[in-house]
Amino acid sequence: MPLLHRTIIFLQLLGTISSNYNAFFAIMVTNPTVVQQVNQIEVNLTQSNPQFVKFVHNISHLHIKLNTVELNETRLPIVQKFLKELPKAMCNVSYSIPALFEGTAVMANTTLYGKVNPMSSSVISSVHQKIFSLLNNTEIPSVDVHDIFHPRMNIVELDNRKHEDLLQIMSNRTGDFKLNTGDFIKEIVLFNSTESGSFHEEIGRAVLAPCSNFTLLRFKKPELISNRVPIFPLEMDFK
């Protein structure tokens, strides 16, 4: 093969690789009481430890990350179609996703996150698995790096530099890290993983709905009846 031909093929391949980018599905947590509690957690942490100011998450964009995928210009129409069909495919898993929190926790001494209760964790994990299964039937590759999915809402994420012991701070000041409320979420949003401005650029969203909204599934019995539960009162203490 002539050198010029090989060079052209290499440049075409390089261009294809460079145009790929990651995107992630997420459920946005916008309940005012949750936002207020997270804001207080961040204030309590940063007032005593100013070094953490640049690592706290913007309370306007609190979210629980689901699946991560690899996109490009060719796959963009495919994922838009995927989002359009997602509510119908998801309705027998959950059309109202509970994000009910029972405190905060620290992971690897670098990430402070809101911990969802067991019921929420089970439903969100089912949603994650359903999206993963649906993606397997498309040309959109999943690039999730975790073997076991653990849903969480990150509040503070530190970099690799040396910082004060986040776990020790939290252990000594447990009253400063209370999070005991939640919400039911009815949208799944897809974002470009590359940050843009104050957050990430939205690619699209899927508004969830019960199966009765879709003619073909009108008489299909939901698989997870236990997902349809009332929200807990906001003042309830999850410990």
From Swiss-Prot:
Glycans are attached at N44, N58, N72, N92, N109, N136, N172, N192, N213. Its main location: secreted. It holds the Pfam family AKAP7_NLS. It comes from the Eukaryota. Residues 1-19 form the signal peptide. The keyword Glycoprotein applies. One of its GO terms (cellular component) is extracellular region. It is found in: Secreted. Gene3D superfamilies: Cyclic phosphodiesterase (3.90.1140.10). InterPro entries: AKAP7-like_phosphoesterase (IPR019510). Keywords: Glycoprotein, Secreted, Signal. This is Uncharacterized protein C35A5.6. It comes from Caenorhabditis elegans.
